[in-house]
Amino acid sequence: MQIKLANPRGFCAGVDRAIEIVNRALEVFGPPIYVRHEVVHNKFVVEDLRNRGAVFVEELDQVPDDVIVIFSAHGVSQAVRQEAAGRGLKVFDATCPLVTKVHIEVAKYSRDGRECILIGHAGHPEVEGTMGQYDASNGGSIYLVEDEKDVAALQVRNPDHLAFVTQTTLSMDDTSRVIDALRERFPNIGGPRKDDICYATQNRQDAVKQLADECDVVLVVGSPNSSNSNRLRELAERMSTPAYLIDGAEDLQRSWFDGAQRIGITAGASAPEVLVRGVIDQLKAWGATGAEELDGREENITFSMPKELRVRSLI
């Protein structure tokens, strides 16, 4: 068996920044540091931060007074921000800047009284945060659609004063079909010049297509609650290549590779490279050889840290 590695894979700039914000806060201020929701959707990362003193909660009413709170990379609603401000909590915002860009778009549509359609997955924290940027007091509404059927059933107040945005971690192919359906039903709909799916999601989906085309089996390292990791697995399967989503080497089953000659490995944007290396080691223990890195797009994007966390404490 030969191992092929997708390129790029693993951490993106937004995930790097979010994890570093928690790490720096722990170093500068000491534990406990409270984090609203998992800072990124990866079991290994969350457990590591928890062991260092991060406390993960789902709502701010689980947070004591006079502590530091970090908002996760997925973003939060305006109501959550107002709740934190009302309690005087010290907040560091780890929202991915590309998610913040979508928030700004929604807020602008809201101020203009323009109704907004969000393409995304119900229940995902990024979707909840983005929906929560819309202020309906101006007379508009924000609607969530997941697929073309939702578009067909959608009832809006003014089809000529309408715009759309998208969740950043969707399947590019699926999203293109939904956008086409929106433009067909609402010819005057506005939106971004390109969809809001982030560069890292696009690059990893392109890379997994190449991987699935060249391999007999594809492994996606990522946690089950990771949206972008699930999209990678689905994309490989649509290309008729068996694909499995795994947290790490402990999830591997040897029977998956019966008759396989080429095994492809990629990782979602919230999965650290150490987990990929563990998978490679296990496959090599079962007789796999090599670990060929495929050609792919170079990523050199970085996002800045909050000012108070840019210099490590000397204490």
Curated annotation (Swiss-Prot):
One GO MF term: metal ion binding
Cofactor binding note of this UniProt entry: Binds 1 [4Fe-4S] cluster per subunit.
InterPro entries linked to this entry: LytB/IspH
EC assignment: 1.17.7.4
Residues annotated for (2E)-4-hydroxy-3-methylbut-2-enyl diphosphate binding in this entry: 41, 74, 124, 168, 226-228, 270
Top EC class for this record: oxidoreductase
Cofactor list: [4Fe-4S] cluster
Catalytic residues of the enzyme: 126 (proton donor)
GO BP field: dimethylallyl diphosphate biosynthetic process; isopentenyl diphosphate biosynthetic process, methylerythritol 4-phosphate pathway; terpenoid biosynthetic process
Positions bound to [4Fe-4S] cluster: 12, 96, 198
Binding residue positions for dimethylallyl diphosphate: 41, 74, 124, 226-228, 270
Record pathway: Isoprenoid biosynthesis; dimethylallyl diphosphate biosynthesis; dimethylallyl diphosphate from (2E)-4-hydroxy-3-methylbutenyl diphosphate: step 1/1; Isoprenoid biosynthesis; isopentenyl diphosphate biosynthesis via DXP pathway; isopentenyl diphosphate from 1-deoxy-D-xylulose 5-phosphate: step 6/6
Biological function: Catalyzes the conversion of 1-hydroxy-2-methyl-2-(E)-butenyl 4-diphosphate (HMBPP) into a mixture of isopentenyl diphosphate (IPP) and dimethylallyl diphosphate (DMAPP). Acts in the terminal step of the DOXP/MEP pathway for isoprenoid precursor biosynthesis.
Designated name of the protein: 4-hydroxy-3-methylbut-2-enyl diphosphate reductase
Native source organism of the sequence: Pseudomonas entomophila (strain L48)
